[in-house]
C-alpha cells in the first residue's frame, strides 16, 4: 500500500445526536441529557478512521449550497483530509438525527440531501485516483450510480473494493459483483436473507450465517463477507470457505454511534496494508469497541496507537 491512498466514496451530514435515558414512545417527548451537533456521515467517519490509521485518503464528499455546508471544510482540515474531496451541489447538505439510550444502543434517521447528487460523472472525473488506490470503499448514504461506476473502475484496475450497505437498501447485482469485501450488521443480514429467498430467522447466528447466507453472497461476487454483531464481535467467511470468528471486546459503552464505520474502515485498511484477516478482524473489533467509549463520533474514532495498545501489539 506504500504511496497509495484509500479512496472513500463518502457522505457528509450535519449530525445531531441526543443522549436519553430510554427511547421515546410514539407521541412522547423526553428530556435529553446531552445534545451534540458535529460533522458526520458514514463516509466521513470512514475517511477519518482511515486517516487515523495512518492511511492517505482521497475521495468524494458532496455538500449543498446552504449554511450547513460550512461545517465541511473545517471538519476536513481538522481530520487531516484533503479539501479536494468536497463536491458542491445545489440543494441541502445531508443531515442526521441520532438517539442513544442509557445502554449505548442507538437509533438514527438520515436525510441524505446533497449526498444523493453524487454521480457517476463525479466518479469518472476522479478515475486516476480510483484506479491507483489501495482500496475503494462505499456505503449507502449515497446513490447506486457512483458506487457502481467507482467499483467497476477499481476492479478493472485490480483494486479491492469494500461495501458497507448502510442504511440498508437492496444491493444491485452490478454493485455486488464488483464488491471484494462486504460488511453487514445483523439487521442488514436479515434483509439480505429475504432478498435472496432465504429464511431470515436465525440467519444472523454464526453457524447459519457461515453455512447459508455467506455462501449465497460469495457466489455473487464478494471474496470476503463479514457479519458484525455489536458487542458479540464479528464473523468472517472467505470465498475458499475459511470461517473466522472474532469475539467482542468488553468496554464501558456510552454511545455506539459510529462503531460500525470504525470497524469497516479498520478492516479494509488493515487488509490493504498486508495484515492477515484474523489480525485485521481483531483490530477492527477493537476500533469499533473503542469508538463506543465516548459520546459522539468525530472525536471518538480511535487512533492506530490506541488500537495497537488494546491489541497488545
Residues covered by each model-derived region:
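Conserved phosphate-binding/catalytic region of the ribokinase-like
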Residues: 2-6, 169-170, 199-313
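Conserved phosphate-binding/catalytic loop of the ribokinase/pfkB sugar-kinase fold
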Residues: 88, 98-140
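A short, aliphatic-rich alpha-helical micro-motif
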Residues: 127-131, 176-177, 219
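Conserved beta-alpha-beta core of the PfkB/ribokinase-like small-molecule kinase fold
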Residues: 135-211, 232-234
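Short gly/ser/thr-rich secondary-structure transition/capping motifs
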Residues: 80, 116-121, 161-168
Amino acid at each position: 500500500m506504500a504511496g497509495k491512498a484509500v479512496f472513500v466514496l463518502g457522505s457528509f451530514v450535519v449530525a445531531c445526536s441526543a443522549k436519553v435515558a430510554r427511547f421515546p414512545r410514539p407521541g412522547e417527548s423526553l428530556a435529553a441529557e446531552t445534545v451534540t451537533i458535529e460533522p458526520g456521515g458514514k463516509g466521513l467517519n470512514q475517511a477519518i478512521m482511515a486517516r487515523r490509521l495512518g492511511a492517505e485518503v482521497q475521495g468524494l464528499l458532496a455538500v449543498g449550497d446552504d449554511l450547513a455546508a460550512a461545517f465541511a471544510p473545517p471538519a476536513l482540515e481538522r481530520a487531516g483530509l484533503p479539501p479536494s474531496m468536497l463536491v458542491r451541489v445545489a440543494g441541502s447538505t445531508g443531515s442526521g438525527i441520532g438517539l442513544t439510550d442509557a445502554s449505548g444502543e442507538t437509533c438514527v434517521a438520515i436525510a441524505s440531501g446533497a449526498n444523493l447528487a453524487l454521480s457517476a460523472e463525479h466518479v469518472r472525473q476522479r478515475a486516476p485516483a480510483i484506479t491507483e488506490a489501495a482500496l475503494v470503499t462505499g456505503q449507502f448514504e449515497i446513490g447506486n450510480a457512483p458506487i457502481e461506476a467507482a467499483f467497476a473502475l477499481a476492479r478493472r484496475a485490480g483494486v479491492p473494493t469494500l461495501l458497507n450497505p448502510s442504511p440498508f437498501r437492496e444491493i444491485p447485482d452490478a454493485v455486488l459483483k464488483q464488491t471484494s469485501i462486504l460488511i453487514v450488521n445483523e439487521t442488514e443480514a436479515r434483509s439480505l436473507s429475504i432478498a435472496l429467498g432465504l429464511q431470515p430467522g436465525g440467519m444472523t447466528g454464526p453457524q447459519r450465517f457461515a453455512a447459508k447466507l455467506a455462501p449465497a453472497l460469495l457466489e455473487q461476487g464478494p471474496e470476503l463477507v463479514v457479519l458484525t454483531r455489536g458487542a458479540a464481535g464479528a464473523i468472517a467467511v472467505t470465498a475458499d470457505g475459511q470461517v473466522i470468528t472474532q469475539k467482542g471486546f468488553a468496554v464501558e459503552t456510552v454511545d455506539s454511534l459510529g462503531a460500525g464505520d470504525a470497524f469497516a474502515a479498520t478492516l479494509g485498511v488493515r487488509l490493504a496494508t498486508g495484515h492477515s484477516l484474523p489480525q485485521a478482524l481483531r483490530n477492527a473489533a477493537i476500533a469499533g469497541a473503542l469508538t463506543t467509549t465516548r459520546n459522539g463520533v468525530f472525536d471518538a474514532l480511535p487512533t492506530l496507537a490506541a488500537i495497537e495498545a488494546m491489541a497488545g501489539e
